[in-house]
Each structure stands twice: as C-alpha cells, then as structure tokens.
Amino acid sequence: MLRVSRTKLGRLSPSLSRGLHHKAVMALRREDVNAWERRAPLAPRHVKGITNLGYKVLIQPSNRRAIHDKEYVKAGGILQEDISEACLILGVKRPPEEKLMPKKTYAFFSHTIKAQEANMGLLDEILKQEIRLIDYEKMVDHRGIRVVAFGQWAGVAGIINILHGMGLRLLALGHHTPFMHIGMAHNYRNSGQAVQAVRDAGYEISLGLMPKSIGPLTFVFTGTGNVSKGAQEIFNELPCEYVEPHELKEVSQNGDLRKVYGTVLSRHHHLVRKTDGVYDPVEYDKYPERYISRFNTDIAPYTTCLINGIYWEQNTPRLLTRQDAQSLLAPGKSPVAGVEGCPALPHKLVAICDISADTGGSIEFMTECTTIERPFCMYDADQHIIHDSVEGSGILMCSIDNLPAQLPIESTEYFGDMLYPYVEEMILSDATQPLESQNFSPVVRDAVIASNGMLSNKYKYIQKLRENREHAQSLSMGTKKKVLVLGSGYVSEPVLEYLLRDDSIEITVGSDMKNQIEQLGKKYNINPVSLHVGKQEEKLSSLVATQDLVISLLPYVLHPLVAKACIASKVNMITASYITPALKELEKSVEDAGITVIGELGLDPGLDHMLAMETIDKAKEVGATIESYVSYCGGLPAPECSDNPLRYKFSWSPVGVLMNIMQPATYLLNGKVVNAVGGVSFLDSVTPMDYFPGLNLEGYPNRDSTKYAEIYGIPSAHTLLRGTLRYKGYAKALSGFVKLGLINRDAFPALQPDANPLTWKELLCDLVGISSSSKCDVLKEAVFKKLGGDTTQLEALEWLGLLGDEQVPQAESLVDALSKHLAVKLSYGPGEKDMIVMRDSFGIRHPSGHLENKTIDLVVYGDVNGFSAMAKTVGLPTAMAAKMLLDGEIQAKGLMGPFSKEIYGPILERIKAEGIMYTTQSTIKL
C-alpha cells in the first residue's frame, strides 16, 4: 500500500475552542463542476472531530460524492440542501457564480491568483457579494511550501494512467506488454488494487517478458515535490532501478530488459547559463532568462516516458518546445534491430504524462488538457496536430487537470488530514467583519484572496495583472499581422479567403489590373493598391517595408525583383512558382538577411513535392530506398467541358501552356538520361497513360527531372520523370500550331499596333507562303500540305477560326496573338468546371528485398460559381504556408521549397479539411 502519512485527529486549537461561537456553522457543498469530481475537502472522520467540538456541520446531499452521505451523517453531519445557515462553506472546486451566497467565507481552489481569465467573472462576483475567499493553493508555511494539497494523489493517478496508455500505444506499435493489464486509475476501488495490478505487470517484466526490440524503458520524473513523490510511489512497485540523468543514455541502450529505469530530474541536471554552461541557483531565481535547458539534448533523447510535475514561469526555459519534439520524433538508429513482426520503436520518446496540466507551459506543445473520459491524445510534431487515436505518428500525451478525482476516497482523506488543523479558525471567520479583526494564523490569513468587497493586500496585484492583460489584448487587437499579396488573378481569391479567416491578419493587394483589385475589394476586407511591380520598384519597396509577409502570385520572372525588396526590408516571402535560377542567385542574400523565402508551394510545383517527400521520408525511416519516381500532373477541363479540338480550356493566359511544348525536357529512364526535344519533335515524347482509362489521358515530360535525385535525396533512383497530363488529342492539335510557326515568341511587326489590321486567313496565307488574296480552298490545301496531310490538325484550325476572316489580336509575337485568341475561344463558360489530376508512382525497395509499387492519386474538381480546382490546389497550400510563417510554425531561415516535414507535414494534413483529398495504393512484388 502507499505510504501516506495521516494526521492524528484530536481537538483543534484550544485557544480557538475556548472561543466557541454558538452560531458558527460549517457546510460541505456538493461538487458540480463536472461529472468526475467526486471528492470532498473533508472525510467523515474529520467531520466527526469537528462536531465533537460542538460545531454544526451541514452536508449538502450528493449521489456523486464517492463517500456516501450516510457516512457523514454517522459522523454527526446534518444532511440538508439549504446551507445558507453556514458561515463557512468548504468545497474542492469553484462553485457556480449564481450559487454564491453573500457575506460568507468560502474555501476552495479558485484558480484566480494568476488572474486566470476564465475565473475573473467568479472573482468579480465574490467581490461584489463581499465574500471572504480562502484559496487552498495559497495555504503555505513559513518556507512557502503548501500545507494543503492533493499533489501526491495527482502523481499516483497520473502514472497509473500513463502506464495504461503506454500499454495501448505500444500495442498500436506492434508490441504486447505487461502494461496492457493496468487500467485507468478510476477503474480501481482504491490505490491498493492499482498497486497490485502494477506489481503483477512488474512481475512479468522481471521474467523478461518485455519485447526485446523496444529496448529498455526509461522514466524521467521532473521535480521533487508531492506530485513527483506520488508518481514514484507507484513506479517503485515495478522492478525499477534509479539512475543519475547522465546515466540515462547508457541504460536506454544497454540496460536490463527485466527492469525499468527511472531518474529524478532537478534544475541543476539540465539548466545551464548561456554564457558558460554553469548552473547558479541563486542567479537563476533572479535572472532565469540567462539560462537554457539542455533537457531536449541531454535527457529527452533517452527517455521513454516523461512524468512532468513542474509549472512553467514566464522567462524560464521550457523543457520541450515544438521544434524539440520534431527532432525527438525523427527516426533514429535503434540499438536493437527490428523485423516485421518485432519492430523497433520509431523513436525513443513514447509518452508524456503532464501532471502539471499547465497548457503551453514547460511542455510547449501541450496546448489543451485531456479529460478522464478522453485521457489520451497524440501530438504529431511534423504536422503540428493533435489527434485522439493512439495509432499513427506522434507522442502519447496525458494531461488530465483533475487527476485526484480518479481516486476520490483516498484523495479526500489525504487532503482532509492536511486541512483539518486549520478548520476551526476558518469556522470562526465572520465575513461581515474586517479581515484585520479575525484571529487567523499566518497560514490562513495569507490565503485570503478577497474579503469585505476588495482584494487582500497580498493579492491586489491580481487587478494589475488583469489590467496588463487587457492592455496587451487591446494592443494585439490593434496590431495586426500585415500581409502584402502581389497579383490579383484567379489564385489570389482562395489565398485571401483562407488568410482572412483570421481576424488578426490585414491584407494589402497590389496589382496593375484595376478591375480585378476593385472586384476583390468589394468581396474581401482588403486594402487594394494599384502597383505595377516591374515599373514601380520604389513603390514596391515602400510597400514591402511595412509588411510582415509578402506573397507573390505574379509571373515567375518578377519574383527576383520582389525578393530583392523583401531582402532589403528583411520581410519573409512566399510564392507558388518554381525557384528559378534567377531566384536561386539570391540565396546567400536571403540567408544574410535572416528571412524565410519559400517557393514551389502550389500544385505543380508544390503538392507534388510534398506528396513525394512524405513518401520518400517514410521509406527512409524503414530503411527502404527509392528505385523509381514518376509524377504526372495536369490541369484540365472537367470531361463534360472538354468538347473542343484541344480538349482543353484556359482560365488564365495560355502563353505559358503553349510555350511549354517548345521547351526541351530531360529525365532518367532505367538508368539512362533521356533528352526530349521540344517543338516539331514534341509529339515523339507524348505517351498514352493507362490509368484513369475513362479520362483517356496522355502525358509528356516537363523540364529537367534529373535534378530531383539530389533535391529529393534519392540518388538510388534509376527512373526519374516529372511530366504534364492532357486529354488525348491535345498534343497532336498543338503540334499543328508548331508546324505552322504559330508558337513563336519572336517579334512580329505585322501585329504591332502601328501595322494594318490582319485577319487570321491573311496571316495563315503569309505563314504558308501564298498570296493573302488566295481563296479559302487554296489556303486549306496549302495548310493541309504544311501539316503533312493531317486532317485532324486541319479541322482543329478550322474549328478555332484560324482560317477565317476574324481579326488577329494586336500582339508582340505570333504566340502572344494566338494566346489572346485562344483565351477567348477556349475560356470557361458559366457553370463549367475544371479539374486537376495528379498521379505519383514510386518503386520502393525494402530491406527485405521486396519491391513496393506505390501510387498516389489526387483528383480535384472545381466548384460551380466558386473556386476552380487549379485555384484551390495552388492557392490553398500557398496560403497555409503563409499562415504557418505568420504563426511561427515555420522556424527555418533561408531560401527553400516545401521539402521538409516542418512544411509539408501540416499542409498535407490541412488540405484535407478543405476537400483536397488524395488516395494511396501499394502492391508488393516478392
């Protein structure tokens, strides 16, 4: 059984008893804060001691209280609903504000001493009703040590819970352990039953029944107070050995599997001065900001389970930050080799029991408490999300804020033993009289938070804390995060919509498209600014200087100009486009400025990178290698909207799409570098796709794929290809344009503004070398011959009106004129939708020799009268990365793409909430 000291009950302070007041009445109110609160501040034997002194004790009826009402009645208590007769009302947790009675003395845990915002309404009501509030938390002795607390039982319940949770988590990771037979603390009638279950588990451990592949288990206890001691009482029932913190590394790797290892951590074990690595306790108490914690590097990497019982104070180092968690969850080389049925742990740190329940405190990523009914959650540091399942990636977390309620009878008796010596002086409290007139001991007097309608002198600081917080809140409301979005095209809307969900973000949109920014200004709460980035560099610089972040949705050729302005003003930057050589040249300047510039955050490039890196990183975690990677992606009209010769439609300028087929491409195929020539040989590189057969797709290679062996970290790949998807027939139709010379960026004087207008018929006559006055039949015959006798290509030209009398748009070049024409002919009509299709294929060679063929499919449709599929899949990942930068989720500095888990992890999770879903499928070849 637990070694819990009990106070011998007898008469209370004689001096107080001699002053017995015949009207002094005490009441135990029932707890109503939540369904699990079954404790009371006093047990029946304490009530008996009080009634024996002649005091009247009222007991408010409660079927929820763990100790039955009749036990209190036997002890002399009077069971009744109305407790208004009492001058002292005792409880454990706060009462509802509407149930407070004026000019009474109340004692409970108020959680007001830090000006906790959630309880300031309660404090205001206490002041209004001139209630005297005694807070158990502030009942301390002359050394400042609490004399009334449930801490030991929080430690007891907490470690029982986390042992149960570890059993579940280890099972999810593929391991049955003796911890499976330990239940939650409240499943036991008393701690003795729980201790027996722990002993049984310990017996199995001592027999060597722990899985070998998980290695020795280590438990780290922070703090030396009652919480830590209570947890250690239970831990000691296991076959345990305590070691010094510096010995953890050795035992975590080479320890005896027939025992578990524990270490008790004090400040001097992990806190060091930043300048010289020394710990000075006196200096630390005065200047904690001069110190850092080495817990993340010296202790945590060798910890299986952390039992945290310390609170975090401002300016003190945290035990673990989110970045620490990312590092700790990175797969390391296990000292024990695992096999498929007996895997090694993905990382050493399996679980954290944060008994302090201090949200956002010493464990930074513990941002919300768990509950007795839902005791566990998993923190996935890569994606920075918390989920309820014990499966998947992450650290198991247990952070229940009312742990002693799980062992309510023993907690009540333990707490009552400590409170009992002070009860009589509290009974004699008369809240109608000045506090100074009361004959209180220092322990009780110093715990009075409020009396006679005002805060006690010792706690007047609470009002100052409230004022400071309110001032800070008003400042934060007035200080918004400023974002400059450059560009007002179709991608900008989902970016604006996503970011403006956060009221603390203020967006300025800069564009030279007056109509577009005016429309955006009507729809969204933005500051529209007329700006031509290429021609107004000074205006761009002044705008950038006032921002926290710049998002460039401009053509890629303008990104270096924007980046230079960001570097000069040390402002972070985001873009969806490729990191071009011109942008890459600024890498050193970006690093020197200490800013973050992230590119390739859209769809392709963007989501394709993220899906690839997630798969590659997971393969590496299990020791597999990537033998092949093929990725095709395309933005297309929905099938029902593809009824034109190109099987394609444009939602933005077609120039980039048209010029793409003129560019050469390089890829790796079965170990050989293949150079695909663009232009007239473009069709030679087009391949029919055998997936999604109902879509009848074709694809062709895009840009230089070979460089991704280094970017993705897959030098083992013998095949690397990234390409573009289109409906079958697209390539052939565009090949006709190439044959005629229409896809040409050279200046064409006949289309300049000062030239005479031309019709398409006249232009085509010129291109095929016949008189502009030739009849249509003659032109068709000449064009047909130029096309090599391809009827399909000729019909495409006719359908598009390129052999008729429609005027050619004025333009700098032939391709610009064709682009303007197609933008009108092949634009999306009302109610028409687009779609994007992506297929990533991987060949993954596992250590066993098996080859896994894995595919990832992403298919997204546009919304009728809403965002297009392309706008969503480009804009939303870009906006998410922007929000992550603003919120401090991305800490890395420099020029980068979305290749790290810090970036791609959260985005791949968050796009699902926006309806962007991808599916995976794998087959294994022996």
UniProtKB/Swiss-Prot annotation:
Residues of the transit peptide: 1-27
Which residues does the annotation say bind L-saccharopine? Answer: 577-578, 604, 703, 724-726
GO CC entries: cytoplasm; mitochondrion
State a single Pfam family of this protein: Sacchrp_dh_NADP
Quote one Gene Ontology molecular function term: saccharopine dehydrogenase activity
Its keywords, alphabetically, are: Acetylation, Mitochondrion, Multifunctional enzyme, NAD, NADP, Oxidoreductase, Transit peptide
Give the superkingdom in one word.
Answer: Eukaryota
State the gene name recorded for this protein. Answer: AASS
Q: State its location(s).
A: Mitochondrion
Q: Which residues carry this modification: N6-succinyllysine?
A: 93, 138, 274, 286, 333, 458, 523, 535, 584, 732, 761
From the UniProt record, list the coiled-coil ranges. Answer: none
Region Saccharopine dehydrogenase: start and end of each range? 477-926
Gene3D superfamilies, per database record:
Dihydrodipicolinate Reductase, domain 2, Domain 3, Saccharopine reductase, NAD(P)-binding Rossmann-like Domain
**What is this protein's name?**
Alpha-aminoadipic semialdehyde synthase, mitochondrial
Major site of localization recorded for this protein:
mitochondrion
Q: In which pathway does it act?
A: Amino-acid degradation; L-lysine degradation via saccharopine pathway; glutaryl-CoA from L-lysine: step 1/6; Amino-acid degradation; L-lysine degradation via saccharopine pathway; glutaryl-CoA from L-lysine: step 2/6
Known SMART domains for this protein?
A: AlaDh_PNT_C, AlaDh_PNT_N
Q: Name one GO biological process term.
A: lysine biosynthetic process via aminoadipic acid
As stated in the Swiss-Prot or TrEMBL entry, residues carrying the post-translational modification N6-acetyllysine are: 48, 56, 93, 128, 138, 286, 458, 523, 535, 584, 707, 739, 761, 780
The UniProt entry's sequence similarity note says:
In the N-terminal section; belongs to the AlaDH/PNT family. In the C-terminal section; belongs to the saccharopine dehydrogenase family.
Comment field on protein domains: The N-terminal and the C-terminal domains contain respectively the lysine ketoglutarate reductase and saccharopine dehydrogenase activity.
